[in-house]
Amino acid sequence: MSVKVKTSGKIVIILLIVGAIFAGKVFWWDKRPREAKASTSIGKVMLPDAPEASLQGNATSLQLPSAEPSVNGGTKIVWKIMAWNAQFPLMYANGGPLTTKGSLMDVAKVQVNIERQDDGNKAVADIVKFAQDYKNNPNTDGVFATFMGDGMPAFFAALVKELEPLGPEYQPIAFYPMGKSYGEDKVMAPPSWKANPQSALGGTVACVIRDGDMNILLKWAGDNGLKVNPDETTYDRNAINLIAASDFLDAPNKYITGYKEKRKIVVNGKKMSQDTTVGVDAVATWTPGDVNVAKQKGGLVAIASTREYASQMPAVTITIKKFAYDHRTDIENMIMALAQAGDQVRSFNDAKKFAGDVSAKVYNEQNGDYWLKYYNGMEDKDMQGLNVSLGGSASFNLADAANMFGLGKDGVDRYKIVYNTFGDIVSKMYPELMPTYPPYAKVVDKSFLQSVIANHPELMEGQSMKVAYASTITNEVSSKSYQIQFETGSSVIKPESYDILDEIMKSSVVAEGLSVGVYGHTDNVGDDTKNQALSEQRAVAVKNYLISKGIPENRITVKGFGASKPIADNSTAAGKAKNRRVQIVLGK
């Protein structure tokens, strides 16, 4: 099966194909938007029948579009997508690979040609060529592409630089998130890694380097205080080591076939003369890579996925700014169509099944039931009898999209946090490839979504996605201690610790599918009862800070352990300092 190739890894090389581009500017004012035309609801009134429906009560189930191609004469757009179930709203809204009569895109008066392009590098080249062609001929058909949100910093770093000769109007912008990976992208590892993350040190993970699924590994490792060796040619027994895979089937295949390679040993950052042979202990992959592991070898379980890191991987759509501003009304009408489609897919089983059927036609692979099954996600047993989770995606309605872009009621810009978090990680690990990346505000244009929200409040009536958080964490995904400074004998946080607290907040936002445990600890100086009370008061202070930054109160659990759980020797000053800590646990 062809695979979903994400945008981070080889993008710099591909963008070298861009040729000379001529300068120029056309103001969008002459084509300024008129009021976007509301999509027409056609269908019967019925009760939503899908689990966790976003529409409530006697909601309207829209009539499914016909299979006949639309001839509405509207703006033509080629939409490049990989085989990824997070795009179910687009499948439903378009009615087929080409816009069909009666579909939401037909009502929006656009004609969309959805093309499967699993090679993200080729999709990048298509965007670059489109910018050049549109510069020379404003009647050129539009080109959109949808990618993983966490991979965008590396993508934009290369693309923005390549398109600079065209001027600011021809830069790429991200304008809408239609859905997200919700479990299918994951790290699969031995059960021992899940039980004790420290056991992962010295282990190896096969993945596509600098890719979204590798980002899941990096977050899990960082949240557990584990180092990752960025050099896929060396071996560090005190870090998690990476084994480069060519794609998302190659990563699990290396595990399945018992792949091995020789590496130079690294100690404290210095390469030794000795060699060692390493195999594959774990994989970072996506569906169907996880299915292959389970069915062909087994022995690995999901230790972290986009089910837990629920904000990490939105399906973000981009185009060239000039085209978007020249066709603002079209863009807004398409956002309306995708938002309505998200509500339909979330609320009605026949709509979701229809999206699966369209997916099979677009991808020209499997059947609708296959894509529907892995959209929903499922539990199964692998060849060794272990329980494994496979697949899982989610569709956004307008409220979900607003929440992702920081336009929801809580004001938390989830995508900004995701973008900066993983941009910083890649820059830190690979400064020679990506020393910097474009500022979020330069490449994410919220104006289209803001306009739809302001002018069509009826589309905000669908319920946004909710997570039922555990009141007590029994399954830890990660645990990390922080040295937060308090006033002596007090729960008042010193200002110099605010940066640490903001780091905790951002990590919690990315891992939106998990509860946040805030556990206070002290050294053994003083009365045990007072220490226990102080540790809890300090944990409460951290909780209140997180709440002030937008983390829901029902997501946070607080405990104070006093001096009962030391991690270092209390007989030394250094040991006492380590024991005075706040432990952050992400779990369920």
How would you describe each model-predicted region?
Residues 22-36:
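Hydrophobic single-pass membrane-insertion segments
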